[in-house]
Amino acid sequence: MDDNVLRVYDSILGMLSGPENPTPLVRLNRVTPYQHTQVYGKLEWYNPFGAVKDRVAANLIADGEARHTVQEAQKLVEPTSGNTGMALAMIANAKGYSLTTPLSSEVPLEKRTMLRFFGADVLELQDTLCPAPGAPEGAIAKATEISERPDYLMLNQYANEANPEAHYKTTGPEIWRQTQEKVTHFVCGLGTCGTITGTGRFLKEQSESVNVLGIHPQEGHDIPGVRSIRQLQQTKLFFPDEYDGLIEVTNQEAFDLCLRLNREESLIAGPSSAIALAGAFKLVPDEPGNVVVVIFCDSAFKYASSVV
């Protein structure tokens, strides 16, 4: 019996977030430059496996099961910069599947260690930090090669509509309800673009006046989980015409704000959370009535060695 009030669940999968079991919204009080605009972080590390990608992994698998492409004892393969892989590994464990994940050796040690700890078969490759489509020796190419074997399935978070659908069904409704329908700006770092696409579409359907803002890192960045403009051209879920704003944040801006979030707000936010917040500060004006929600993708625990 799942009970979101008493927080009693039949299995760990019952803890996956949704409109009746949302991840928290926490107002920022010390790092914001505003007098009037209210800024909230949506703390996605409260998902059971620690990141916003838990939503995506769960829906990718559920969609595959519904389509009967995910079979009993299925062998899954997925290229990742860490968070999707960790969520897929743990959900696979709960359902009797297995996961092979090709990834870059530049992915933080904490993530690579946890993937192995969770039971994934980790294949470290000489790839860019975020898997690069078109790289013949990269993680995406390796996963595609493995998926051609008859006993493997690649869920393909970079093109699968089940990715944004997860956020259309959960993240968007959560934010609309948690802000009592008052959200004016939704801000998100760009990786696969599933979060901004699904959440943004839902919020725009509720009110066309909601501003959807996408934040990307500089070229040559070292922030896992987000993609530069050049890298974004490769994901099939990047729809910039649907955004009201798009802006770049530097490594230094992201890492500096990451430290401030931890040390001044006592929020254990990672660098991909900070990059989204830094972009919000650049794009959102200080006006009465502004209610800004920024996706804080995951915690700093997986990045401490690379931030400090």
State what each model feature region is:
Residues M1-V308:
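PLP-dependent amino-acid enzyme catalytic core
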